[in-house]
């Protein structure tokens, strides 16, 4: 009898111990807010991504650029040729710094942009290709810098860059190209002329021209 009684007592004590451990585990888990925090992170992350997508999809950089160009009198085909060059030069990243200099200076696109806006680098004269069309010549970068300062924007601002481009195209050096872009009905020719006359990239092969022509044709279909 004494042995059985002891076994029952031990058994009951074990049950009580298990119950107490479970109770305290639940209490601690609830009181430290861990489960609530995880839930909050999950629910806040999704709406943020959705909002970002909703904000950018209706008015893409491509659409912003196209609309400003057309408003300036450039034809549908001409605008698509310019878009094709932006695609080839920067993939429509308006803060794009020429990749070679990212590695050389050890800075990101965003860091270079911030340093430029704060006048902590010689943005105008450093020969670093920048922006949608990779402005490199000091005349182009000076024009972009002046426009940004006048408008109170960053040099990475899309509208500022497009308006700067238009003003450059109006100068005597590019007046023939500007007139051509206003009159042309060929997106492929627009892409080619803009590339050879304005961009003047190191690679001017038929393959490079063809790539930009294909981009122009695609934009022509999208915005038609």
Segments and roles (model prediction):
Residues 6, 39-41, 48, 88, ...:
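Intrinsic disorder/low-complexity signal
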Residues 63-66, 79-84, 188-192, 213:
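Short, well-structured alpha-helical segments
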Residues 2, 6-37, 141-224:
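Non-catalytic cell-wall polysaccharide-engagement segments
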Residues 10-71:
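N-terminal export signals and maturation junctions of secreted/periplasmic proteins
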Residues 74:
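Cell wall/extracellular polymer interaction/catalysis modules
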Residues 46-64, 90-182:
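Peptidoglycan-targeting cell-wall enzymes and recognition modules
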Residues 40-46, 80-82, 144:
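Generic signature of intrinsically disordered, low-complexity, basic-rich segments
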Residues 77-93, 100, 195:
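Short, functionally critical alpha-helical segments immediately adjacent to catalytic or ligand/cofactor-binding
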């Amino acid at each position: 009898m004494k042995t059985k009684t002891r076994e029952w007592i031990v058994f009951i004590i074990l049950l009580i111990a298990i119950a107490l451990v479970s109770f305290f585990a639940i209490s601690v888990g609830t009181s430290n807010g861990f489960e609530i925090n995880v839930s909050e992170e999950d629910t806040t992350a999704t709406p943020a991504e959705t909002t970002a997508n909703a904000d950018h999809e209706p008015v893409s950089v491509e659409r912003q650029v196209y609309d400003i160009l057309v408003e300036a009198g450039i034809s549908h085909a001409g605008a698509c040729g310019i878009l094709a060059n932006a695609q080839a030069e920067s993939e429509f990243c308006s803060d794009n710094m020429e990749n070679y200099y990212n590695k050389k200076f050890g800075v990101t696109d965003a860091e270079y942009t911030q340093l430029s806006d704060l006048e902590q680098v010689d943005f105008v004269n450093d020969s670093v290709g920048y922006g949608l069309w990779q402005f490199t010549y000091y005349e182009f970068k000076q024009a972009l810098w002046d426009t940004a300062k006048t408008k109170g924007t960053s040099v990475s601002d899309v509208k500022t860059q497009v308006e700067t481009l238009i003003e450059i195209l109006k100068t005597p050096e590019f007046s023939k190209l500007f007139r051509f872009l206003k009159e042309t009905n060929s997106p492929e020719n627009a892409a080619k002329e803009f590339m050879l006359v304005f961009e003047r990239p190191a690679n001017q092969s038929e393959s490079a021209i063809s790539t930009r022509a294909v981009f122009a044709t695609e934009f022509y279909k999208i915005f038609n």
